[in-house]
């Protein structure tokens, strides 16, 4: 699956973007550098099972084991001590990144209830796109009977684009379903 999206990028998207933006060199064409999947787990500090099940779910979705993010300092109001587990993060690059992007665009996003497309306003000004998902059940790898609680995740697609216009064009050519 990963090779399909990489081939699509090299064979189709690079020439399209070269014509559209007038790049002289194919190395000027923006590309996706990495995809970061993040899940904040505020309640994991009290319950270690939540952390383990979330780590397993994220590794099934991403195809790569996640890293536990820990708190930097203690905050008494949140019942949080220093270096306590507060989330999970996975950074995908290369073939795994293209494979995840393919599954996200073609399998997961269409399975969202009442889906009309994703917002084109979630770019950061430099062509990077952030997307929040409210549940993990949209991924076909997740078994409904094995989840203990519905949890969302944040997905950031980091590109080499210099502005939002290039980012929209790049992701649209990959087939990202933006709202009209």
Curated annotation (Swiss-Prot):
One of its GO terms (biological process) is translation. InterPro entries: Ribosomal_uL5, Ribosomal_uL5_bac-type, Ribosomal_uL5_C, Ribosomal_uL5_CS, Ribosomal_uL5_dom_sf, Ribosomal_uL5_N. Coiled coil: none annotated. GO terms for cellular component: chloroplast; ribonucleoprotein complex; ribosome. The keyword Ribosomal protein applies. PROSITE patterns: RIBOSOMAL_L5 (PS00358). GO terms for molecular function: rRNA binding; structural constituent of ribosome. It is found in: Plastid, Chloroplast. SUPFAM superfamilies: RL5-like. Gene3D superfamilies: 3.30.1440.10. Keywords: Chloroplast, Plastid, Ribonucleoprotein, Ribosomal protein, RNA-binding, rRNA-binding. Its main location: plastid. Belongs to the universal ribosomal protein uL5 family. Binds 5S rRNA, forms part of the central protuberance of the 50S subunit. Part of the 50S ribosomal subunit; contacts the 5S rRNA. PANTHER family: 60S RIBOSOMAL PROTEIN L11-RELATED. This is Large ribosomal subunit protein uL5c. It comes from Oltmannsiellopsis viridis (Marine flagellate). The lineage of its organism: Eukaryota, Viridiplantae, Chlorophyta, Ulvophyceae, Oltmannsiellopsidales.
